[in-house]
Amino acid sequence: MDRKDVSITSFDGLRLHGRYYEYKKGAPTEILFHGYRGNAERDLCGGVHRCFEIGHNALIVDQRGAGASEGHVITFGAKESRDCLAWVDFVIKNIAKDARIILTGISMGAATVMMAASCPLPENVIGVLADCGYTSTKAIIKKVIRDMKLPAGPIYPLVRLGALLFGRFDPDKESPLTSMKKCTLPVIFFHGDTDDFVPCYMSEENYAACAAEKKRLVIIRGAGHGLCFPVDPDTYFEELRRFFP
C-alpha cells in the first residue's frame, strides 16, 4: 500500500504531518483524526484498510502535539477543529479541486470533526463520521477526574485555569454538542454500548442535538472505547455504505 507523506502549516504556525493513501482517483477522500494522546500510524492504520475496503482514499493526520506533528498542547478539539479546516483546504488544493471529503474522527478526533462541522466549509465536504465522541470538553474532563476517584468540584477549576494559561483555550466553551446544534452536514455517529471511557449516552445526546436532516446513530453491541469497527466490521461497513452511497 503506497503512501505519501504530506504536511500543512496551522493557523498558529505549527507544522502538521499526515499520510495520504490513494485508493483511486475520483473516489471520496476521508480525512481521519485520532484521539487523545494517539497518533496516526498507531491508531488509524486500521482506518486506512477500512477506507480501501469501502472504496475511499484516506488521509490520516497526526493531530497537533502528536506523532510527527509539532505542538505541545492538546486542546480537545478547540484548535484541532481549525486544523481540520486546513486539512480540507489541503485536499482541495493538492489532491483534487472537486474532491468529495468525509471528516472522520475517533474519540477526541470525533470531537474535532464535530466542532469543525459547524464552521463554514466548502461544498466538497459531504459528511461526517463521528465515532465515540464526547459532548463537551468540560464533561469528559470531569468524568476522567471522577474515574480517578478524585473530587471534580475542586480539581476541575484548576484544570480549566491550566488550559486558559498554557493552552489558550477554555474547556467551558468547547462543546461538540453545541456545534451539532449548528451542523447541517450529514453525520453518522458510532458508539459502543460498553464504552467505559466516553459513555454511549454522549453520542446519543450529540445525535439528538444534531440539526442535520440526514443523520444516523449506530450502537455497536459489546464494543468498548474506539472498538466499534473491530468488534462488528460487517455492521460498520453496511451502515457506511448505506449512509455514503
What are these regions (language model features)?
Residues 51-70:
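Conserved alpha/beta-hydrolase
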Residues 115-170, 178-179:
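Hydrolase active-site cap/lid region
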Residues 74-95:
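Alpha/beta-hydrolase active-site loop
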Residues 223-233, 237:
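Catalytic histidine-centered segment of alpha/beta-hydrolase-like enzymes
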Residues 36-50, 63:
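The serine-hydrolase catalytic nucleophile loop
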Residues 182-184, 189-191, 195:
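Short beta-strand/loop motif that positions the catalytic acidic residue
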Residues 196-202:
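Conserved alpha/beta-hydrolase "acid-adjacent" motif
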Residues 1-25:
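N-terminal cap/lid segment of alpha/beta-hydrolase-fold proteins
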